[in-house]
Swiss-Prot record:
It comes from Pseudomonas putida (Arthrobacter siderocapsulatus). It comes from the Bacteria. Residues 1-29 form the signal peptide. This is Quinohemoprotein alcohol dehydrogenase ADH-IIG. The gene is qgdA. Belongs to the bacterial PQQ dehydrogenase family. GO terms for cellular component: membrane; periplasmic space. Heme c binds at C635, C638, H639, M676. Its cofactor is pyrroloquinoline quinone; Ca(2+); heme c. Catalyzes the dye-linked oxidation of primary alcohols to the corresponding aldehydes and the (subsequent) oxidation of the aldehydes to carboxylic acids. Active with primary alcohols, glycerol, 1,2-propanediol, 1,3-propanediol but not with methanol or sugar alcohols such as D-sorbitol.
Length: 718
């Protein structure tokens, strides 16, 4: 049942929650389920059986003191239970576990409350996300999880709402629309954090042209407490606070006002209770090309920056910019970890981050001073770090595409050396465990200033990037050039202690434990445990799908469990579908929970249907070429470049005869339950036919190249 309005609802209303078998469930064992507050999170080590915040603790270390499962017995792990999610798309959530109840999310921000002992559903809450707006999300209809506080569960909804749910009943308590401008493509995929009674959430949308900000809301009522903008607005208007006074001086011209400027804080936060500082990871610019965004001038603060603000007021305190004047989608939204490290023989309270640009940063978290920075993967865009200025040294010949007149092959590329998949820190080993990428892509300046496209589901990048060969052999060669690895990084020595290779990128986030273990899922469909000190693989089982999310561990009734959220999807398998086929998996979304001696059976997806024979190929090459351009501009971000899908959304080369007959109706009518908008305002019937003819041509290519496509899947031997 759809809920409307922003007011609190009566408790007797069930919203869209499903209540099952409430009597005797662990969620009701406590007087108030999910009864978490700041003091409890700060003292989390006193109750290590719970996982009460996204990173377990405010320092976001993703380290658990539990050690019933250890390097001595992890080989005895077996599946304890599984729970099948409703929709097979990308799964990125970190579950929250409190007092025997698990709270997690699936695609389109659906929230599940499960019995952490056996996976029984307690309730399910569907926020009825406006699914036709899924095309306004850059990277699939994903969600990275919830927050809990004093009996409420908080979720950011894909369409821009923040909602509070009663943890006992699954009913909506309040809802707020976080969007500052409904004409812009704002979305939410990140997990909220709750600090000092305030729910903090950012947003996504920089690829579509928005202005980024972070907002804090009263956890009890949903009333806005403060908002911090990450990039300046109209220079004709007064700046919003000290932060924007500083930032405005680093932007030039006024093109960014129409473009939005970007700087969305779509994922990472951390909090230091002693300093009362909230750390915000800020994203890329709108547009990507700095010439069209800011006349190729200025640092464009606070793009690609870590910003510290007062947690109570949202007032600016300090910033450190990882990539001044970002031009490559080198966000600083990646996971931040707070720790105390020995630096030059003295203990320092630091913030650590491995953002997309390939450096690993150690920063004084009180002042923002850069203490050290080293590259964790090959970097063609920079010649190193100037420690006197704290700025990377740009390699203009190999990366400054907006002024060197070249199509530059840049490493790392837009999904970075490390993306949203969380890293973890183990204070016992002193190592940070990073799910890293090795990838390159072309960036090319366009000679004319781009005009904003009014169609809200269209990328607004201001350059050419992501170019790939069309033929299967060229795509296979490119796919083999992208790889992943798990890096155990020593943040004091700034060097790798050990590494484990993977066949492709987008492997899962990591969890480390006092049992000398590191857990990680892989893109090619495995869940794995390594020895935290040496990297030796100690345990592995199939996961029935790719695993991108970070696992958690908890205990109930004295028994330790490890949970992975499995489900292939996200940006890699949509936009770069052909390259993602290296993983050799299909989307199959489920919660997988393991314990010592577990004997449950893994659920597997059904085999894919055979590829239909395509209709007759048109000899109208002009229409096919026109259709290719339209497809590239409007369709590739979801269905894949060159119409090669990674399997999360339909591969349009494999349409059935019925779908070919319905093609015009599908594009003009949309498929809202699946997240596909109507394109009636974007295309004429003639243009739809051109796209259709192009897809038929690509279907014929598929049949001719069939043997090569069979070589794409390459499961890792590790």
């Amino acid at each position: 049942m759809r809920q409307t309005g922003l007011a609190s609802l009566p408790l007797k209303s069930l919203a869209v929650a499903v209540l099952l078998s409430l009597a005797g469930t662990p969620a009701l064992a406590a007087d108030i389920p999910a009864n978490v507050d700041g003091a409890r999170i700060i003292a989390a080590d006193k109750e290590p059986g719970n996982w009460m915040s996204t990173g377990r603790t405010y320092d976001e270390q993703r380290y658990s003191p539990l050690k019933q499962i250890s390097d001595q017995n992890v080989g005895q792990l077996g599946l304890a239970w599984s729970y099948k999610l409703d929709l097979d798309r990308g799964v990125e959530a970190t579950p929250i576990v409190v007092d025997g109840a698990m709270y997690t999310t699936g695609p389109f921000s659906v929230v599940y409350a499960l019995d952490a002992r056996d996976g029984r559903l307690i309730w399910k809450y569907d926020p009825q996300s406006d699914r036709h707006r899924a095309g306004e999300a850059c990277c699939d209809a994903v969600n990275r999880g919830v927050a809990v506080w004093k009996g409420k569960v908080y979720v950011g909804v894909l369409d821009g709402r923040l909602e509070a749910i009663d943890a006992k009943t699954g009913q909506r308590a309040w809802s707020v629309d976080t969007r500052a401008d409904h004409k812009r493509s704002y979305t939410i995929t990140g997990a909220p954090r709750v600090v000092n009674g305030k729910v903090v959430i950012g947003n996504g949308g920089a690829e579509f042209g928005v202005r980024g900000y972070v907002t804090a809301y009263d956890a009890e009522t949903g009333k806005e407490a403060w908002r911090f903008y990450t990039v300046p607005g109209d220079p004709k208007l007064p700046p919003e606070g000290k932060g924007m006074e500083i930032a405005a001086k680093t932007w030039f011209g006024d093109a960014y006002v129409e473009q939005g400027g970007g700087g969305t804080a779509w994922d990472s936060f951390a909090y230091d209770p002693e300093l009362n500082l909230l750390y915000i990871g800020v994203g890329n610019g709108s547009l990507w090309d700095p010439k069209w965004r800011s006349q190729a001038k200025g640092d464009n603060l606070f793009l690609s920056s870590i910003v510290a603000v007062n947690a109570d007021t949202g007032e600016y305190v300090w910033h450190y910019q990882t990539t001044p004047g970002d031009a490559w989608d080198y966000t600083a939204t990646q996971h931040m970890i707070l720790a105390e490290l020995p630096i030059d023989g003295k203990p320092r309270k630091v913030l650590m981050q491995a953002p997309k640009n390939g450096f690993f940063y150690v920063i004084d978290r009180a002042t923002g001073e850069l203490l050290s920075a080293k590259g964790i993967v090959p970097q063609s865009w920079t010649k190193g770090m100037d420690m006197k200025t704290g700025r990377p040294i740009l390699d203009e010949e190999n990366a400054a595409y907006w002024k060197n007149g070249k199509r530059n092959l840049v490493t790392p590329a837009f999904w970075g050396a490390h993306d949203w998949q969380p890293m973890s820190y183990n204070p016992d080993t002193g190592l940070v465990y990073i799910p890293a990428h090795i990838m390159s892509a072309y960036y090319e300046h366009i000679p004319e200033a781009p005009k904003r496209n009014p169609f809200k589901s269209m990328y607004q990048l201001g350059l050419r990037t992501g170019m790939m060969p069309e033929g299967a052999e060229g795509l296979l060669e490119m796919a083999k050039s992208w790889s992943g690895k798990l890096i155990a990084w020593d943040p004091v020595k700034q060097q790798a202690a050990w590494e484990v290779p993977y066949v492709t990128i987008f492997n899962g986030g990591t969890l480390s434990t006092a049992g000398n273990l590191v857990f990680e899922g892989s893109a090619d469909g495995r869940v794995i445990a390594y020895a935290a000190d040496t990297g030796e693989k100690l345990w592995e089982q199939p996961a029935a799908s790719g695993v991108m999310a970070a696992p958690v561990t908890y205990s109930v009734d004295g028994e330790q469990y490890v949970t992975f959220m499995a489900g292939w999807g996200g940006a890699f398998s949509t936009f770069a579908g052909a390259l993602s086929l290296r993983a050799g998996v299909q989307p199959y979304a489920q919660v997988l929970t393991y314990k010592l001696g577990g004997t449950a059976k893994l659920q597997e997806p059904a085999p894919r249907p055979d590829t239909p024979k395509p209709p007759a190929l048109s000899n109208d090459t002009a229409s096919i070429e026109a259709g290719a351009k339209l497809y590239d501009g409007y369709c590739s971000q979801c269905h894949g470049i060159h119409a090669v899908s990674g399997g999360v959304l339909p591969d349009l080369r494999k349409l059935t005869p019925e779908k070919h007959q319905m093609f015009l109706g599908i594009l003009f009518g949309g498929r809202v339950p699946d997240g596909m908008p109507s394109f009636a305002d974007a295309f004429t019937p003639e243009q739809v036919d051109q796209i259709h003819q192009y897809l038929i041509k690509r279907a014929h290519d598929l049949h001719q190249e069939g043997d090569t496509w069979k070589q794409f899947s390459a499961k890792s031997s590790h």
